[in-house]
Amino acid sequence: MKVITAFLSVFVLCSAEDDDKLTVASNDLGMRMLPLLPSSPGENIFFSPYSLSIAMGMAYAGAGGETRQELHENLGYSRAGLPEAEVLDAYARQTQRHLSDPSNTTVDVANTAAIHLGLPLLDEYETILRNSFNADLQKVDFVENGQGAVDVINSWVKDKTHNKIESLFSEPLDPLTRFVLLNAMYFKGTWKTEFQKRRTEQRSFFNGGVTQAQVDTMIGKIRIRHNSFNDVGVDVAELPYRGGDYSMVILLPQEKTGVEALKTNLTAGLFKTLLDRLVQRQVTVFLPKFKFESKYSLKEILQNMGIRRIFGGGADLSGISGDTSLEVYDVVQKAVVEVNEEGTEAAVVSAVIGGLRSGSFDGFEFRVDHPFLFFIRDTRTNAILFVGQVNHL
C-alpha cells in the first residue's frame, strides 16, 4: 500500500508534442517564482505563470534597449532559446492556438490595454497588441476620473473571469498612471473520472504539516498516472480532466513537513522528468476539497529575479508611445481556485501598471493530508497555467 499525505499541485497545459520555446520560458518563470512568493503554514499560494508571462509580454513589446534585454533574459526567453526577434511571433502563435483550438475544458484567455486618454500610442505598438495578443484598447482617464478608470478595468476583469474575480483594484490608481496592461484567464475542467459526493467524508489534513484538522476529503478509485520517487522524496499523481487536454498534477512530499524543501528544489526540468516517469495504474485517491484566493504585488519578487530596469532607473518603454519617461510601477496578480467532486474552476488576472516617473484501501493510495503543491497544465503544449501550494485548510 502506498500512502501520500501532503501535496504540491500544479495545473498545467501540456502537449504530446515537444514544448515550444515560449512555453518553456513561461514554465521556467513559474518555477523560479514559486519559492519567492510569500508562504507560511497558515497561508496558501495560487498564481499563474502563464497569465503573468502574457501580461509581461505586452510590456516587453514596448520595451527597448537594456530594458528589453533584461526582460529577455529574466522572463526566460533567453534560456529557452527564443531569440528577441521571435518573441512576439511566439506570442502570436500562442494566441492563435487559444482562438482556434477547441477542447472539452473551458479555457478563456483575454487581453486588454487600459490607456490614458492623453497617451498617444505608437501605431506599431497598437498593431503588436492586436496581432500578437488579440488585445483590445480601452481609453480611460487616470487623471480626472480615476475611479471611472478602475471601474472600467474591474468591469472587464469581472466579465472575462466569468464573475469569479469581481474586482482587481479597490481605489483609483496614481494620477500619473498612463497604462495598465491586463491578461485574464478562466479555467473550468471536469474530472475525467468524477469523485462521488456520497463518498466525500471528514478526514485529517495536517495544516503546516503539523496541526491536525478535519476537512471534507474526496475519495475515489481512479485510473491515473502515478509514481513514487524516493530519490526526490515525493509522490506524484496526475488527475486528467475530461477530454485529456488538461490535467492537475499533485506533488506530495513524502515527509509531512517537506513542502518547503520540495518547492525550493523544484525546477522545470525536474518537473518534466517526474512527469515522464509516471505510470498508468489504479489508485485510491484521497483529495481534500478546497477553495481560496490570492493576490500578489510582484514588483519586489520580479526585481529579485533580475527584472529591475523596467521599474525605474533608466526604464525604456519608448516603444509604447515614444515617451521616454514611462516606467512600470507594479505588477499585480489576483487568482481564485475551487476544487470539488466535479472538477476545478479557476480564474486569474495579471496587470502591469505603468506611467510617468515621479520624482486503508487495497492497492495504491494517494492520500493528500498535508501541505502540497499543485499545477494545472495543458497536456498538449506542456504549459503550466496555474501553480498552487496548499498549507492550510
Curated annotation (Swiss-Prot):
Stretch forming the signal peptide: 1-16
The keyword Cell membrane belongs to this UniProt entry's keyword annotation: no
BP terms from Gene Ontology: immune system process
Glycosylated residue positions: 104, 265
Location(s), subcellular: Secreted
Knockout or disruption consequences: RNAi-mediated knockdown does not affect time course of blood feeding, feeding success and weight of fully engorged nymphs.
InterPro entries in alphabetical order: Serpin_CS, Serpin_dom, Serpin_fam, Serpin_sf, Serpin_sf_1, Serpin_sf_2
Stimuli inducing this protein: Induced by blood feeding in nymphs and in the salivary glands and ovaries of adult females.
Keywords: Blood coagulation cascade inhibiting toxin, Glycoprotein, Hemostasis impairing toxin, Immunity, Protease inhibitor, Secreted, Serine protease inhibitor, Signal, Toxin
UniProt note on tissues of expression: Saliva (at protein level). Expressed in salivary gland. Expressed in ovary during blood feeding.
Molecular function as annotated in GO: serine-type endopeptidase inhibitor activity; toxin activity
Domain of life according to the entry: Eukaryota
GO cellular component terms, semicolon-separated: extracellular space
Subunit relationships: Interacts with human KLKB1. Interacts with human ST14. Interacts with human F2 (thrombin).
Summary of the function given for this chain in its UniProt record: Serine protease inhibitor that modulates blood feeding of ticks on vertebrate species. Moderately inhibits host plasma kallikrein (KLKB1), matriptase (ST14), trypsin, plasmin (PLG), thrombin (F2) and coagulation factor VIIa (F7). Slightly inhibits host alpha-chymotrypsin, tPA/tissue-type plasminogen activator (PLAT), uPA/urokinase-type plasminogen activator (PLAU) and coagulation factor XIIa (F12). Slightly inhibits the extrinsic pathway while not affecting the intrinsic and common pathways of host blood coagulation.
Protein name, as recorded: Iripin-3
Organism annotation: Ixodes ricinus (Common tick)
